[in-house]
Amino acid sequence: MAAALRSNTSRETASLTLSHFRYFIFNRIHTARTATSPPHCNHRSKSDEKFPYKISSLGTSFLDNRGGGERRNSTKCYAAQKKLSGVGSSVVILSSQGDPPDLWQPPGDGVSVRVNGSSVNLGRGGGGGGSSPGGPGNGTGSNSKEDCWGGSNLGSDFPTPKEICKGLNKFVIGQERAKKVLSVAVYNHYKRIYHESSQKRSAGETDSTAAKPADDDMVELEKSNILLMGPTGSGKTLLAKTLARFVNVPFVIADATTLTQAGYVGEDVESILYKLLTVADYNVAAAQQGIVYIDEVDKITKKAESLNISRDVSGEGVQQALLKMLEGTIVNVPEKGARKHPRGDNIQIDTKDILFICGGAFVDIEKTISERRHDSSIGFGAPVRANMRAGGVTNAAVASNLMETVESSDLIAYGLIPEFVGRFPVLVSLSALTENQLMQVLTEPKNALGKQYKKMYQMNSVKLHFTESALRLIARKAITKNTGARGLRALLESILMDSMYEIPDEGTGSDMIEAVVVDEEAVEGEGRRGSGAKILRGKGALARYLSETNSKDSPQTTKEGSDGETEVEAEIPSVVASM
């Protein structure tokens, strides 16, 4: 019995000695790790607070788990240290949650850092690339790319509707009503975002014990998307592009005809947001205040009711897929722009502050409007649409007047679903450009087509000259082709093709090309072999040409700012009157 007691006592003594040894080793390891860790990594987990240096029967496995936990914490601290490399100040980790991924990335919103008393969020924020504050990258630092964007960041310096409209006038000819409506809509949109962000900041700065504002003061403003309707070449895309450039926000153009419902061959609607994120240089905060222009929405109308039972994945299906995105929701966008995958990485983008502008030609919608107004027939049932097809100018004028009275019911009758139309409270109709407006498009804007081609010829030290009658004839041809301003470039390319082939070859003396002249004869011969712009060779050739034309009975004056030929001006009223 005594031997058994002595044996038990010796075993207990050995076990106690082993426990003390384990405690000693663990304490030494922990002390060494604490001494060598950065100052901001000296924090204890919840298990440390509950069981400080406690060795249980788990033995070695417990130490392994603790070591794994410490490795995870040290990895997180290394991430924060790498994030703030080069910052000569004390850093204190306020909170740290979750395990790091297999491949290290910048810490998420769960890590908050205090630098010299000020709080800094190490989250990816606007698509940060892991750079330190003040360094290059797209994080949320003071020198990040978010600061270079406009929108609500302009605050009280955001341009007024009159200033926006004035900026549009420098690039867009005509469409005065559309420019006014768009200016007001864009101004209200970004004023709403700035108001909400300022309210959140003021709410965060006030003390929690302070009295909360009344419910009447907390009014949530909703955005107003825009739907542009007008013939091709009337300036729909140019208006949206110029607006985004003027307010300095990310802008992307999407084609509705390439979109399909999720799960079918084609592009998902989420691909639009990925393109916007790419334009914003993966700055999520900037992308969430961008402008998205979806073109050709009139091509995704519902298909006619028929015996075909197949699903309309490129028509009504696309409209259904766009509904929540247009209204405002958090969309999971695939990180690499591919289709959604259950195990793929996604980027969350909130669309409630993204301004969506949709555009379409809506061909023949004036017939639907005319039928709604009960003026589709006159007398004994003679259709108005037959008279509309009789002449070009009258057709465009009647269609423009009818488009100004378009209503939501007309769009629904055209093929858009009511839910889709309801997401666009601002309806803007654009009219077809007139002959004089097309002449202005050629000469007046900052990026006028005439100025573009003159710059191109100037690169080869050649002057490009347009006569007034040539410009007017080019505008008339564009109206005849029913392509609007888009048809002007095609006409100029055809007229100037032969001269652009010749001018790169530099000549000397009398073979030197000094100027190229586009007159009425060159425009009339457009498309015929051997015709086109006149090539003037030799020094002083342009001056001699101008002197010869001025000596004729009906002088041809030069391009911008001139009144043009009197007989041409007299033809316009007679043409309109005959129609």
UniProtKB/Swiss-Prot annotation:
Biased composition regions of type Gly residues, renumbered to the chain: 123-140
Leader sequence residues: none
Homology family: Belongs to the ClpX chaperone family.
Disulfide cysteine pairs (residue numbers): none
Span list, region Disordered: 99-153, 197-216, 546-579
Presequence positions on this chain: 1-46
Binding site for ATP: P231, T232, G233, S234, G235, K236, T237, L238
Function: ATP-dependent specificity component of the mitochondrial Clp protease. It directs the protease to specific substrates. Can perform chaperone functions in the absence of ClpP.
Subcellular location: Mitochondrion
UniProt-recorded Gene Ontology molecular function terms: ATP binding; ATP hydrolysis activity; ATP-dependent protein folding chaperone; peptidase activity; unfolded protein binding
Biased composition (Low complexity): 108-122
Tissue: Constitutively expressed in leaves, shoots, roots and flowers.
Designated name of the protein: CLP protease regulatory subunit CLPX1, mitochondrial
Keywords annotated in UniProt: ATP-binding, Hydrolase, Mitochondrion, Nucleotide-binding, Protease, Transit peptide
Alphabetized Gene3D superfamilies for the sequence: 1.10.8.60, P-loop containing nucleotide triphosphate hydrolases
An example Gene Ontology CC term for this record: mitochondrion
Gene Ontology BP, a term: proteolysis
Listed Polar residues bias regions: 547-559
